A protein has these predicted regions:
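Acidic/histidine-rich, surface-exposed loop or edge segments in extracytoplasmic proteins
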Residues: 30-42, 99, 140-141, 200-205, ...
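Acidic/histidine-rich catalytic neighborhood of metal-dependent amide-processing enzymes
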Residues: 104-217, 246
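Extracytoplasmic/secreted proteins, especially bacterial periplasmic and envelope-associated proteins
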Residues: 22, 26-33, 47-64, 115, ...
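Solvent-exposed loop/turn segments at secondary-structure junctions
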Residues: 41, 73-76, 88-91, 101-105, ...
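Active-site-adjacent substrate-binding region
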Residues: 46, 172, 183-313
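Bacterial Sec-dependent N-terminal signal peptides
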Residues: 1-22, 337
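A non-catalytic alpha/beta surface segment that caps or lines the substrate-entry region
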Residues: 29-87, 237
Length: 337
């Protein structure tokens, strides 16, 4: 048997797509373009918001089947989501991945949330030319930050509502929310409730996959394949929507429309004390680990319809919990992956 034949056999037996690699050089270039602007990209600074939206559009349009602005009016001003799609000719429910590009106040917002936006920009490059099992829509949202958070003016609300109104079939949605800040210092990780420190540890060196109880097939499959990538230390949590932090991003609006949705995050202010501060700059980010998060998201997207991860679905035990009576501490032990 020659080497070529052996290689073909290995590929046939391999149940998953070989992982692509994000580019740390590209990540740095995108972070610079988004954060080092003349002014800050908040709702009161429309020229800079539009500058960043145009940049995102220019990157999307290099790689995607279709790219467009989704515009809407708030108090007489026009704001823009930037949307692109891959696998447009596939007749299956779409997978949405999104991140907001606006910031809160006069600060660069590198982790919150240029890091998430760079994630979807890199996903666009990595998905280009790939054979997909279902359509993938990447969205850069405007107006996630206060004073619009939890209002119908959020860009993600506008997008999710448009899918609902157009009767678009949606498999699931994943929000990339602050994926660039990590710390190996003991005590660098906080939580909304103290017992979580026992389960997840006190060091902010992991990425967290956040889901609510009662989630569907998408969140389970995505989480399994994200874990399967084995690129970065990963933790899972499936908790009641009432737990503080569970809905702190754009995925909450897809929940409102009845879609299966989740968040990939470094836990925001529970770890990164630069949150909503001028110190949230790209110089504080861990580009290497950020790239590993992007690689895992890509791996999950391209393998989402392959059922054989070689691992248990991380949702299975959590679903069992829904109909059982356990103490809250037992529940916390259960949600750990």
């Amino acid at each position: 048997m020659n080497i070529k034949t052996l290689f073909i056999i290995i590929l046939m037996l391999c149940p998953f797509t070989i992982k692509a690699q994000s580019s740390e050089k590209k990540i740095t270039e995108h972070l610079t373009a988004i954060t080092k602007t003349d002014g800050f990209r908040h709702y009161q600074n429309l020229p800079v918001l539009n500058q960043v939206a145009d940049y995102i559009h220019s990157v999307f349009s290099k790689y995607a089947d279709t790219t467009y602005f989704q515009t809407y009016n708030v108090d007489g001003k026009i704001y823009k989501n930037v949307v692109c799609r891959f696998g447009s000719d596939i007749n299956k429910p779409i997978l949405v991945a999104g991140a907001h590009y606006d910031v809160c106040g006069d600060q660069e917002g590198a982790d919150d949330n240029a890091s998430g936006v760079v994630g979807i920009l890199e996903l666009a490059r990595m998905l280009h030319g790939k054979t997909l099992s279902r359509p993938v829509e990447l969205v850069a949202y405007t107006l996630e930050e206060p004073p619009f958070f939890r209002t119908p003016q959020m860009g993600s609300y506008i997008h999710a509502e448009s899918l609902k109104k157009n009767n678009t079939s949606v498999y699931g949605m994943v929000a990339l929310e602050m994926i660039g800040y990590f710390s190996d210092e003991p005590g660098s990780q906080d939580y909304p409730i103290k017992p979580m420190k026992i389960i997840y540890g006190k060091t902010g060196n992991f990425i967290l996959l956040v889901k609510k109880m009662g989630s569907g097939e998408f969140t389970g499959n995505f989480s399994s394949w994200f874990d399967n990538a084995q690129t970065i230390k990963t933790r899972n949590i499936t908790a009641p929507a009432e737990l503080e932090g569970i809905d702190f991003s754009d995925h909450l609006n897809y929940w409102k429309m009845g879609y299966d949705a989740m968040m990939v995050t470094n836990t925001a202010f529970y770890r990164n004390k630069n949150y909503h501060q001028t110190a949230d700059t790209m110089e504080t980010l861990d580009i290497n680990r950020m790239s590993k998060v992007i690689d895992a998201v890509y791996h999950a997207i391209v393998n989402i319809d392959n059922k054989n991860t070689g691992k248990k679905n991380p949702e299975e035990e959590r679903v069992k919990y829904t109909n059982s009576r356990k103490s809250y501490m037992e529940y916390l032990l259960l949600i750990m992956s």
